[in-house]
Amino acid sequence: MVNTNKVKGRMKELELTQADVAHCLNIAQPTANQKINNVRPFDLDEAEKLSHLLHIDAGEFGKYFFTQ
């Protein structure tokens, strides 16, 4: 599961929108919304692309994309 609060907080810090995330992942904005809000899962490729967009380093990756 995605740590929704961390992802949304990082998006806010970088002034990114769900449309920006959707463009990065080559998906529709409603799909990006569902993934960010844990309605649909991210696959590993999408998580890696989003981590680059959000400037998340490898040491922080798990805090954003592997929550219980």
Label each PLM-derived region with a short phrase.
Residues 16-34:
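Short alpha-helical DNA-recognition segment
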Residues 8, 19, 48:
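Residues within the helices of the helix-turn-helix
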Residues 55-68:
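Short C-terminal boundary/hinge segments that cap the last helix of small helical domains
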Residues 1-16:
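A short, Lys/Arg-rich alpha-helix, primarily the initiator
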Residues 36, 46, 65:
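DNA major-groove recognition helix of helix-turn-helix
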Residues 9, 34, 63:
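DNA-binding alpha-helical recognition surfaces that contact promoter or target DNA
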Residues 11, 22, 51:
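The alpha-helix within a helix-turn-helix
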Residues 39-49:
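Short, basic-rich loop-to-helix N-cap that marks the start of a DNA-contacting helix
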